[in-house]
């Protein structure tokens, strides 16, 4: 009976997603997906090149697949005051295998000095949206006592198209002032049409605002000096898409190579959604050459009406790598704190 219940829950989620507007996924480890969070964070790190990848397996207890992946590569080009990069994002949702693949180019330009850096970023790319209509379950295929009846036929007529391409654009701004960072971004500025049927279904803009503050816990701390900590870094991220709002708020404790975090996230209407625990490990493979490998793991304990017993929560894993190029001068136009120092 539990299996039938979970299956019907998965079907409901899929059908809801098709009948309403498509809502973007959000990462609990937003700090390990900078290119996805805000294009203005492109090139905002200490080395010459940065690679990031993050995978989210949402509500693994349900039979329908809800998984998301983002991979990015960006270059820090301080002599030109900015950075360039590429971002690939893939999502797979529900038993109907509703999939999105997006590839986008990012560019960011920064102005300022040692104490203050203001960055502006733009993003432009293309998305392919696909669905397998044969995997959908319609109402006339569900028995009130037995649930879904495998092999049963439906009289529902499905659209002729199962794939859609569209252009997508975003922009953002980010400010770093001493131990404070704040940013904002707007995604889907052009509100692309995602419809498979010809009936217009525009993707609403996603608004994101984030802020972090770096609090040194050591009496030996001096601004602008390299220090392994310890630090407390409280952060908040606000998301809004159409009439759905969400807030992630919490703090990270960072000491040397270990970063632990505890977060609270609200659901679309402001009610509790999840408690998130994260662990980040920085492995410096070659400090002199700026080589750093970052490994991250987090788990969301669902607190909403779709409870933890049914969903088994959500798990994210991330990996990042950054380094200087051979024979790099290590020249950095901005010698103060960068976005990297806030996560």
Task: Identify what each model region corresponds to.
Residues 51, 64-67, 141-187, 193-199, ...:
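Transmembrane beta-strand segments of outer-membrane beta-barrel domains in Gram-negative
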Residues 18-22:
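Sec/Tat signal peptide C-region and signal peptidase I cleavage site
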Residues 9-17:
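Bacterial N-terminal signal peptides
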Residues 23-36, 40-41, 56-58, 62-65, ...:
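Outer-membrane beta-barrel translocator/channel fold
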Residues 170-192, 200-256, 263-265:
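Detector for outer-membrane/organellar transmembrane beta-barrel domains
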Residues 43-55, 84-86, 234:
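Transmembrane beta-strand segments of Gram-negative outer membrane beta-barrel proteins
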Residues 1-8:
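Bacterial N-terminal signal peptides that target proteins for export
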């Amino acid at each position: 009976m539990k299996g039938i219940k979970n299956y019907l829950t998965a079907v409901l989620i899929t059908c809801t997603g098709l009948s309403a507007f498509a809502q973007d996924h959000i990462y609990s480890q937003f700090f390990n997906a900078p290119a996805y969070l805000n294009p203005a964070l492109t090139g905002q790190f200490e080395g010459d090149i940065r690679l990031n990848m993050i995978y989210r397996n949402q509500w693994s207890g349900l039979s329908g697949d809800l998984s998301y992946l983002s991979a990015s590569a960006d270059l820090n080009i301080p002599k030109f005051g900015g950075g360039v990069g590429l971002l690939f994002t893939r999502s797979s949702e529900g038993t109907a295998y509703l999939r999105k693949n997006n590839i986008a180019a990012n560019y960011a330009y920064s102005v300022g000095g040692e104490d203050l850096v203001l960055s502006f970023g733009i993003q432009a790319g293309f998305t392919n949206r696909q669905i397998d209509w044969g995997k959908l379950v319609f109402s006339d295929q569900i028995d009130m006592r037995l649930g879904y009846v495998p092999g049963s036929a439906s009289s529902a007529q499905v659209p002729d198209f199962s794939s859609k391409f569209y252009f997508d654009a975003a922009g953002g701004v980010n400010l770093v002032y001493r131990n404070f960072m704040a940013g904002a971004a707007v995604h889907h500025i052009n509100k692309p049409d995602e419809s498979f049927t010809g009936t217009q279904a525009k993707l609403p803009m996603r608004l994101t605002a984030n802020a972090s503050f770096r609090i040194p816990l050591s009496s030996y701390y001096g601004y602008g000096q390299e220090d392994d900590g310890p630090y407390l870094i409280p952060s908040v991220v606000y998301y809004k898409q159409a009439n759905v709002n969400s807030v992630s708020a919490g703090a990270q404790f960072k000491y040397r190579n270990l970063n632990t975090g505890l977060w609270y996230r609200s659901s679309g209407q402001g009610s509790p959604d999840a408690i998130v625990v994260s662990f980040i490990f920085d492995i410096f493979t070659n400090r002199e050459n700026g080589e750093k490998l970052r490994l991250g793991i987090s788990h969301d304990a669902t607190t909403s009406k779709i409870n933890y017993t049914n969903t088994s929560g959500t798990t994210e894993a991330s990996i990042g790598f950054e380094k200087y190029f051979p024979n790099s001068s290590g020249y950095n136009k901005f010698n103060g704190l960068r976005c990297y120092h806030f996560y």
